[in-house]
Amino acid sequence: MKKITILLISLFLSTTLMAAGSDSSSSDTPKASIYDDAVKLVKRAGKLEKKQKLDKAKKLYAKAFSKLEKAYKSDKKNPDILNYMGFTTRKVGNFDQAEKFYLEGLKIKPNHNGINEYLGELYVQTDRIDKAKERLEVLKNCNCEEYGELELIIKTRGSKVY
C-alpha cells in the first residue's frame, strides 16, 4: 500500500510539474513550430547531403526555406531565422541571396556565432578568403566550435565545408 501511495504521489507531482512548465504563449506558437519544422528539414537535408543524395537534400533545403520565410514574416528580429534562411539558400547555390540574409542577421546580432561561421564559409566558397578571415576574427574569443570549423574550412580552402 505504501508503494502505491508513493507511486500515485510521484505521478501527481510529475504531471503537475509538467503542466507548470508549459505555457500556451511560449514556443507552441505557430511561428515557433514553423521554425522548428524548418530546422528539422535542414537537419534531414544535411544527412542526405552527407550520403551524397544532393538532389533530395536541395529539395528539403528549399522546403525548409519556404517555412523559414513564413516564420520570418511574423518574427523579423530573429537572427536565427535569418541564419537558416542564409544557410538554406547557400546550400541550393544562391550565394548572393544567402549573403544578404546573413548580413541582415548580423545587423540584429553582430556576434552571432552561427551567422559569422556560415558567412565565412560562403566567403570561402566564393573565393573571398580575406572576408572569411574577418568572420574568423569576430569568432576568435567565442570559445566555440564555430571558430574551429571556420578555421579548418579556411585552411583547407573549402574542402571541409560542412
Task: Give residue ranges: language-model regions.
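Terminal, low-structured helical/coil segments at or just beyond the last alpha-helical repeat
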Residues: 22-35, 47, 133-162
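Structural marker of alpha-solenoid helical repeat scaffolds
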Residues: 74, 108, 139-142
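Residue-level recognition of tetratricopeptide repeat
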Residues: 78, 112, 144-147
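Register position in tetratricopeptide repeats
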Residues: 50, 91, 125-126, 156-160
